[in-house]
């Protein structure tokens, strides 16, 4: 994916501010974890494939400086984080994961005005419209 300079600047700024740079994460490469369920891994692949088709840069398994590892990071997209829910529910995400994200994204999530996350249910057939 050829990036415009504005997109590259957005990515650089996001990664400088939030990503743990001691871990190298290539752009537009799908990294999967054996610890995830098959449905969860397939969900991540489907989302990444749709993003790639649309020319939207993404990163998977990015370790943030706060210690959190979102499923997919999309610094130039509508929202910065895409979470694929496999065995967990929205309530489980809120109880177990949300507090690990940087404060400004938690506040945006809680305000209901601006979105920080897109959630994809791995148990349902993937529909790329949920990403846009």
List each model region and its residues.
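Polar/charged alpha-helical tracts
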Residues: 9, 13-16, 53, 91, ...
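Generic detector of leucine side chains in alpha-helical contexts
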Residues: 3, 11, 15, 32, ...
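Short, flexible coil/linker elements and helix-boundary hinge sites characteristic
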Residues: 16-28, 55, 76, 97-100, ...
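Interdomain/boundary linker segments immediately adjacent to catalytic/signaling cores
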Residues: 1-49
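Catalytic cores of nucleic-acid endonucleases
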Residues: 79, 84-132
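Active-site metal-binding core of divalent-cation-utilizing nuclease and nuclease-like domains
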Residues: 24-36, 45-90
């Amino acid at each position: 994916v050829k990036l415009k300079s504005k997109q590259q600047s957005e990515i650089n700024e996001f990664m400088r501010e939030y990503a743990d740079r001691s871990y190298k994460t290539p752009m537009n490469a799908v990294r999967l974890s054996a610890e995830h369920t098959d449905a969860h891994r397939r969900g991540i692949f489907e989302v990444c494939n749709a993003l790639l088709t649309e020319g939207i840069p993404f990163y998977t398994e990015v370790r943030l400086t706060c210690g959190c590892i979102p499923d997919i990071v999309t610094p130039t997209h509508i929202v910065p984080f895409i979470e694929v829910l496999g065995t967990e529910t929205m309530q489980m995400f809120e109880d177990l994961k949300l507090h690990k994200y940087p404060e400004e994204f938690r506040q945006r999530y809680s305000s209901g005005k601006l979105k920080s996350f897109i959630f994809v249910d791995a148990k349902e057939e993937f529909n790329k419209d949920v990403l846009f």
